[in-house]
A protein has these predicted regions:
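Conserved binding/catalytic microenvironments
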Residues: 4, 149-463
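Short, flexible, glycine-rich and Lys/Arg-enriched loop motifs at helix boundaries
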Residues: 33-42, 332-340
């Protein structure tokens, strides 16, 4: 993976400005404090500060010394994360566990965003940890309410700040649907690290404002996790989704919690972990029931049904799908959060088609996959998914020419996207068609897939 350019550090610049401290002044005070503490090896000057402002991460103990110097000048504690520098002692499980205290949630997520911006080895090499998923779901279900979001910093957070986060989240979500997660990930991460982290750490907020801020952060963190998942960065995605769930708990937002748990179930299914997907889906259902949206509950039910299908449990899958259909029949748009607008009859049909595909019921899969194509044209990636799904059903029906015709439509859309999932679904289709390599259309299509799609990203094959 190519290294991203080093990000500048506006937070350090802002703190130096607030403290009225020059580059030379900061360097001199850092050296003096190091000597006073008996740390003789610290050497820095104004050019060192210029490098820090450009995004360089100094080695320990320099970040802690900078924080102490600026804290003394400002008359308040300055944590290392507020400097725009990642603490040097990041734990290997950063972001994998669900915190319950607001201060812990802010510190963990800010450190996660900063480490991701800096492409720290911890996250570049982050693996998906299946054992961490049920623990988060259990904690969501059984823990007492999380602490209320409150900040006492110098920056007043108001309604306009929260609406700005939500507006940008909506814009990013629309772009994600049209372009795929790869093009969006850096933009979303930069906004989280540069702007949202600043509000959380330095903001003054409490009560309803604090809860609304937590909910907005949860929505954006969930989207950040989703685009990382779509980009094939599953270990990073898992950490973002877990922290998004923490923000939903602090906000007391059961609907958002259900959506995030369903997203975690979605990822678990993709990574062939159906047991964990079922557990997460059931936790999501509990949250959805507390909110009261029948549409949201339907989403959580079909995720559970897909988990049963992936385990080849046709009976449990059928029972759960029937419950999902009855639930959706009584759904109304008035019950739904704005971010749930994507879930409609076409989306439900696609989820059902995936269940029947995994159960080996090709005719049912094809019928529902065709229904799924009666969808909103703004969801380009979703259409690519559904076309690949229909093509896969045709392949299972032993109709290789039809599979290649529909698969080529999916391929034409996929090459416009930066979506590891979309590319992998096409490769999976080509793999399923391989036994019919005697058919000219199959040979042509599989060759075109190899030629037009980039090298495979590092992620597991979908079910």
């Amino acid at each position: 993976m190519p290294q991203r350019p080093r990000a500048a550090n506006p937070r350090l610049r802002a703190l130096m400005g607030e403290a009225r401290m020059s580059n030379k002044g900061l360097a001199r005070r850092v050296v003096d404090l190091a000597k006073a503490r008996g740390v003789a090896h610290v050497r820095c000057d104004h050019t060192s500060v210029l490098r820090w402002l450009a995004g360089e991460q100094p080695r320990p103990p320099v970040p802690e010394l900078i924080a102490s110097v600026l804290g003394d000048a400002l008359g308040r504690p300055v944590p290392e994360i507020e400097l725009g520098m990642t603490p040097s002692d990041l734990p290997a499980d950063l972001g994998l566990h669900l915190p319950t205290e607001w201060g812990d949630t802010v510190a963990i997520s800010a450190a996660l965003w900063r480490a991701d911006v800096q492409r720290r080895r911890l996250l570049v090499n982050a693996a998906f940890v299946a054992a961490a998923m049920p623990a988060s779901a259990l904690r969501w279900l059984t823990s007492p309410p999380a602490s209320a979001p409150a900040g006492s910093g110098p920056v007043r957070v108001g309604h306009a700040d929260i609406e700005a986060i939500r507006d940008l989240t909506l814009s990013y979500r629309e772009l994600d649907n049209r372009l795929g997660g790869g093009r969006l990930r850096t933009m979303i991460l930069s906004y989280l690290d540069d702007h949202v982290s600043h509000l959380l750490i330095n903001g003054s907020y409490r009560g309803d404002t604090g809860q609304q801020l937590a909910a907005a952060c949860g929505e954006l963190s969930q989207l950040a996790g989703w685009v990382a998942y779509d980009s094939g960065e599953h270990g990073v995605a898992q950490r973002y989704l877990t922290q998004a769930l923490a923000y939903a708990r602090h906000a007391g937002d059961h609907a958002l919690g259900a959506e995030i748990l369903a997203a975690q179930a979605h990822q678990a299914l993709y990574l062939t972990r159906p047991g964990e997907a079922i557990d997460l889906s059931r936790a999501a259902q509990a949250a959805a029931l507390k909110h009261g949206s029948a549409t949201l509950l339907t989403e959580c039910l079909v995720m559970e049904a897909h988990g049963h299908a992936a385990r080849d449990d046709a009976s449990a899958c059928g029972t759960t799908l029937a419950t999902a259909e009855r639930t959706f029949d009584r759904a109304t748009q008035e019950d739904n959060p704005a971010w749930l607008a994507y879930f409609d009859e076409a989306y439900l049909a696609a989820r059902m088609a995936q269940c029947f595909r995994d159960l080996g019921e090709a005719d049912h899969a094809a019928r529902y996959a065709r229904r799924s194509l009666d969808m909103d044209g703004r969801y380009v990636r979703g259409r690519a998914f559904n076309l690949a799904l229909l093509a896969t059903a045709h392949a299972a029906q032993n109709e290789p020419e039809r599979a290649c015709t529909v698969g080529r439509q999916a391929l034409d859309l996929t090459v416009r996207l930066t979506s590891a999932r979309s590319a992998h679904y096409l490769r999976d289709l080509a793999r399923r068609l391989r036994p019919r390599a005697d058919v000219p259309a199959v040979r042509d299509f599989t060759a075109e897939v190899r030629e037009r799609l980039p090298a495979a990203a590092g992620h597991a094959a979908p079910r």
